[in-house]
Amino acid sequence: MISVSDLIALFRRALSEKWGYIWGTAGTQWTALKQENLEKTTDADRALERAYGKKWIGHKVADCSGLFSWAFRQLGGTMYHGSNTMFLKWCAYKGELKAGQRTDRAALKPGTAVFVWNGKT
C-alpha cells in the first residue's frame, strides 16, 4: 500500500531538485529535442511552455497529475496521467453544472472529483 508520507517524501524530493512544470510530462528530463519539437507546435495552449521551456532543458519536469503518476510508479503503484483520462475512466456520474448551481456537501465524499469539461476531447 502506498502511504501518504512516502508520497510527500517524493514530492519534497521533486521540490528540492527544483523540478520544472511542463504540461504533459511525468518526471522526465526535459531535453533540447523535446523543446525543439514543442517549438514546432502552434497550439495556443502551449505558448507559455514554448516561451519558458528552454530554462528547463537538462532538468526533470512534470505537470500536476504527472507528478502524482511519477510518484506512484516510484512506489510500485499506478495512476493515470491526466485529468481527462481520470475523468473518462473513473467518472461514476456525469451531469451538468450550471453557473450558480450548488450541491449539498453531504453528497461529496473523500475522493470526489469535480471536472469541468468544454465538450472537446
Q: PLM features: residue spans?
A:
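N-terminal capping segments
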Residues: 1-77, 118-119
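...with weaker cross-activation on analogous glycine-rich loops/strands in unrelated enzymes
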Residues: 2-9, 17, 77-121
